[in-house]
Structure formats: C-alpha cells, structure tokens
Swiss-Prot record:
GO terms for molecular function: 3'-5'-RNA exonuclease activity; tRNA binding; tRNA nucleotidyltransferase activity. It catalyses: tRNA(n+1) + phosphate = tRNA(n) + a ribonucleoside 5'-diphosphate. The lineage of its organism: Bacteria, Bacillati, Bacillota, Clostridia, Moorellales. This is Ribonuclease PH. The keyword Transmembrane helix does not apply. The gene is rph. Homohexameric ring arranged as a trimer of dimers. Transmembrane segments: none annotated. The keyword RNA-binding applies. Phosphate binds at R87, G125, T126, R127. Keywords: Nucleotidyltransferase, RNA-binding, rRNA processing, Transferase, tRNA processing, tRNA-binding. Belongs to the RNase PH family. InterPro entries: ExoRNase_PH_dom1 (IPR001247), ExoRNase_PH_dom2 (IPR015847), ExoRNase_PH_dom2_sf (IPR036345), PNPase/RNase_PH_dom_sf (IPR027408), Ribosomal_Su5_D2-typ_SF (IPR020568), RNase_PH (IPR050080), RNase_PH_bac-type (IPR002381), RNase_PH_CS (IPR018336).
Amino acid sequence: MLRANGRGLRELRPVTIERHYLKYAEGSALITVGDTRVICSATVEEKVPPFLKNTGKGWITAEYSLLPRSTKERTIREVTRGRLTGRTQEIQRLIGRSLRSVVDMSLLGERTIWLDCDVLQADGGTRTAAITGSFVALAEALAGLVAAGGVPAMPLKDFLAAVSVGLVDDELILDLDFQEDSHAGVDMNVVMTGSGQLVEVQGTAEGRPFTREQLTAMLDLAGEGIESLIAIQKQVLGDIASRVGTGNDK
C-alpha cells in the first residue's frame, strides 16, 4: 500500500518535540507527529487528592482537549456542552495512569502534577502523541523540583512513549494517520517504557478478528517505533535524560 508522503509501512511520521513552549508552566512541550500537533504542559501543585493526604506520596493526573478547529469539522468545546465525552475521559485516564507507571510517588512527596494536553491539530494518534509529549513536560517539571530542592531525587524511573500500530488492507503499519485509522481492520495503541515493558495495550478489530501471531507482530513493531520516539525524547531533554532512572540528582 502507498502511504502519505511516501513513508514506509514501518516508518513513523516526522516527529519533533519543542521544549519550553509555554512561558509560565513548570514544564511544557509542543509535539508534532506529521500533521498532529499537541501542546503538553506540566503544573506542580503543593497538594494531593484527599485519598493521599498524610501518605507522603504524590499524584500525577491529566486533562485532554481538542481545540474546536483541530478537526476537519468544528468540535464543540466540552465546557460548552457542560460535560466531558466518554472519549475524553478515557484518554485523560490513559495519559495519567501511563505517566504514573514511571514515577516514584514516594519521592514526589505530597504534591500533584497536572499534565494538560491541548490538541492544536488532529490527524490521528493524538492520545499517543499526548503521552509522548507529556513525558517530556513532566521530566522538565521534575528536574526543576529537584534543582530547587523540592524533591530529594529524580522521581522518574524510566522513559515512556506511545504509538499506534494497525492492519490496513492486511498490511501491518506503524503510526496511523487519520485516513489510515479510518480504514484500519485493526487499530492498536501501545504504551511502553524505555526498558521495553508494556504499560497499556488498546487493540480493536473492525470487521474480523486478528490472530495471536498478528498481535505479536504489532507489539514488536510498536516497540520499534517507541524506541525511536524515546531516542527523540532523550535528545530533546539533554542533561535531564541522563538522570531518568537513576533515582538521584547527580
């Protein structure tokens, strides 16, 4: 099959991550994946939800939203609707629990870090881009806390990124854009750590089931894509990258 811009079946779209994108946030990044663009910002609050009070542990949570014209047809703001859609709630929870999986909450202390993910333009893979970009914003915020003496050591235990894989016309492909996603027989989102551990796998067949062998092949391809995404994260984070997984502030 032919893909947009002539990319290969096992090839990511062009990916860039720009740090310090917002002036006031403790951490921020603009991630661009092909024509998908998401601003991810990290905000540190010196408090935790009630269920974590007096535990000495922190919390990571997320919000996600689409700008009205991030999509081909105008998307009504959810504040106007007066409620979050099920899709938005699902994505917010996915981002939050994915990031929590690589943070030592006892090192974070009793504080909350909010990750706000605002989609400027949606062309497939917004949730996976939000996770990949949010990791960079979170790392930036945590490095600032360590530098200020707010936390004793770097709480990040590992890198984290996410990507989509799928079957389109019986071809296994990496990083689906909107058009490919719309025609996919199988669409799967995979979240994985730098050490290759799985955090989340969301896979759905459309029309007919897929085999265990195809599942394994999709996970292997996702692993290749995530390895490339983490290499970009490391390059963008510079010195901060060397402190991820060390549990110290050296």
